[in-house]
Amino acid sequence: MSIEDLKNTVTKLQERIQELEKKAGIIPDVPKSVRMVLIGPPGAGKGTQAPNLKEKFCACHLATGDMLRAQVAAKTALGVEAKKIMDQGGLVSDEIMVNMIKSELENNQECSKGFILDGFPRTIPQAEKLDSMLESRKTPLEKAVELKIDDELLVARITGRLVHPASGRSYHKLFNPPKKDMTDDVTGEPLVQRSDDNEDALKKRLVTYHKQTEPIVAYYQKTGIWSGVDASQKPTKVWSDILKCLGQN
């Protein structure tokens, strides 16, 4: 048997082993890509589910608030422009936000297999600008998944919420506690409770959220990419429902 024949035999054996390991559940079957928007009110579980999606699809998680802070801290051209507007008490324009997302998609290696957008778009003009940019890159959105939950349950959830500021990972004192009290499971760093995670502040945020989000949901329903998931369920059930929406059983 020649060296070339041996190489071919080894390659075939490796492929067969991988196939058997996948069937046995030893190697996860990594999907090709994901391009999605995650919609949901504060406390619906986006901070729990987005890292799961990122890991499952080997994609980037673009939480627009974190992205904006990172660009400002790194003093990128867009970050400098955004800081100037924020320092004057203004709102960062849709164009700057869409360009920041575009910059991440072009320069962040994690985005090569797709992206999970979280916190954007919040208005119809933002959704239209985002669609236009993504279509020009030939990477249109495939899915908009909405985490749906009753406001009263949200209030109960959020008043016990704990957050790891650096990563955005979130926990709950009752429903999803960290392994060690007030400590992030991954880094061992301390967790915090956000100052705006109180009942009055939350109710105001929810009024704003519903006003902003209903048109966005209608927009994605019209384009045919919207799916709703009951976010009042246990995180593991929410996760399996999200995967079903994405065609993963």
From Swiss-Prot:
ATP binds at residues 43-48, 161, 170-171, 233. Residues 63-92 are annotated as: NMP. Residues 160-197 are annotated as: LID. This is Adenylate kinase. One of its GO terms (molecular function) is adenylate kinase activity. Pfam families: ADK, ADK_lid. It is found in: Cytoplasm, Cytosol; Mitochondrion intermembrane space. The gene is ADK1. Monomer. InterPro entries: Adenyl_kin_sub, Adenylat/UMP-CMP_kin, Adenylat_kinase_CS, Adenylate_kinase_lid-dom, AK2, P-loop_NTPase. It catalyses: AMP + ATP = 2 ADP. Residues 177-197 are annotated as: Disordered. Consists of three domains, a large central CORE domain and two small peripheral domains, NMPbind and LID, which undergo movements during catalysis. The LID domain closes over the site of phosphoryl transfer upon ATP binding. Assembling and dissambling the active center during each catalytic cycle provides an effective means to prevent ATP hydrolysis. Its EC number is 2.7.4.3. CDD domains: ADK. Catalyzes the reversible transfer of the terminal phosphate group between ATP and AMP. Plays an important role in cellular energy homeostasis and in adenine nucleotide metabolism. Adenylate kinase activity is critical for regulation of the phosphate utilization and the AMP de novo biosynthesis pathways. The keyword Nucleotide-binding applies. Keywords: ATP-binding, Cytoplasm, Kinase, Mitochondrion, Nucleotide-binding, Transferase. Belongs to the adenylate kinase family. AK2 subfamily. One of its GO terms (cellular component) is cytoplasm. AMP binds at residues 64, 69, 90-92, 119-122, 126, 194, 205. GO terms for biological process: ADP biosynthetic process; AMP metabolic process; ATP metabolic process; DNA replication initiation; pre-replicative complex assembly. HAMAP family: Adenylate_kinase_Adk, Adenylate_kinase_AK2. Its main location: cytoplasm. Gene3D superfamilies: P-loop containing nucleotide triphosphate hydrolases (3.40.50.300).
